[in-house]
Amino acid sequence: MTSAIFLAMLCLGMALPSPAPDPILDVEWQKWKIKYGKAYSLEEEGQKRAVWEDNMKKIKLHNGENGLGKHGFTMEMNAFGDMTLEEFRKVMIEIPVPTVKKGKSVQKRLSVNLPKFINWKKRGYVTPVQTQGRCNSCWAFSVTGAIEGQMFRKTGQLIPLSVQNLVDCSRPQGNWGCYLGNTYLALHYVMENGGLESEATYPYEEKDGSCRYSPENSTANITGFEFVPKNEDALMNAVASIGPISVAIDARHASFLFYKRGIYYEPNCSSCVVTHSMLLVGYGFTGRESDGRKYWLVKNSMGTQWGNKGYMKISRDKGNHCGIATYALYPRV
């Protein structure tokens, strides 16, 4: 094809033909579509198959290199296999990090006797992993998770709280529902509203809706919230002494999208820009402590088939890797 014809096709909005599919992957492609309920038009099929094959090649290349000791984690094909990185990054919008005035963040005296391992999930503070689906509601899952942990600490009862309540009702505070939200503004809503419903009375719908909060169904409330100073020592102190912490990371990478298990380290991660909210539920290390394979344990909201049953380990003490300590806060109840 000449360059002139190529340019003409672009100007006319014509799609270039997809590359021929690899017949060796036919069975795997069909199994993947069935597993994740994928169905395409004839036109879409070739395009999506090409994207899927490209992602599959990247995953196999990464895992091959991991077997040679180049990486510390594996990747796996999942429900996002038909997404290009460009499409994924359109969803991973940069989260504005509030400027915290002096005296507004918590700076407790750092303990020298912190536990070497913390896992609040094992202690009953964490509800099951959910799937945010088509709604960009990671911020709401992060906030409900942090409140659930503190309510369990206070009452001994672990009650799943309503993500949809936050999606529908925190617009007056500045959130944008399924388009974009901020954990700080979501906590402001709960505090100003005087309560938050449970998942049982206000279930998740994966879409924006009108606010239908009912005070009589309020299940949890907060008295305020605190920012954690932007360093990993303070974050370690907070998660050890307080419980699950709302955090955000830079998740704009294929390595994140197809993460499976191991300690995640992405050389291209930013320590300043964060795009995806998660729930920090612990920390630890693998092997011997002197080996330096330290990690943060975080809960995601992309379902149990993502990562290690919905969880991820992120490199700890590696220069605030992926911005794990850049935007951390927790509620007071």
Curated annotation (Swiss-Prot):
Signal peptide boundaries: 1-15
Active-site residues? 138, 276, 300
Family (UniProt): Belongs to the peptidase C1 family.
* Record flagged with keyword Nucleotidyltransferase: no
Q: Which GO terms describe its cellular component?
A: lysosome
What is the name listed in the Swiss-Prot or TrEMBL entry for this protein?
Cathepsin M
Q: Does the keyword Transport apply?
A: no
Which enzyme class, named as a word?
hydrolase
PANTHER family, A to Z: CYSTEINE PROTEASE FAMILY C1-RELATED
Annotated glycosylation sites = 217, 221, 268
Q: Which organism is it from?
A: Mus musculus (Mouse)
GO MF terms, alphabetically ordered: cysteine-type peptidase activity
Which SMART domains does this entry report, sorted A to Z?
Inhibitor_I29, Pept_C1
Which cysteines share a disulfide bond? 135-178, 169-211, 269-322
Which residues belong to the propeptide?
16-113
Q: Which tissues does it occur in?
A: Placenta.
Q: Where in the cell is it found?
A: Lysosome
What residue ranges carry the coiled-coil annotation?
Answer: none
Gene Ontology biological process terms in this record: proteolysis
Sorted alphabetically, the keyword list is: Disulfide bond, Glycoprotein, Hydrolase, Lysosome, Protease, Signal, Thiol protease, Zymogen
E.C. number: 3.4.22.-
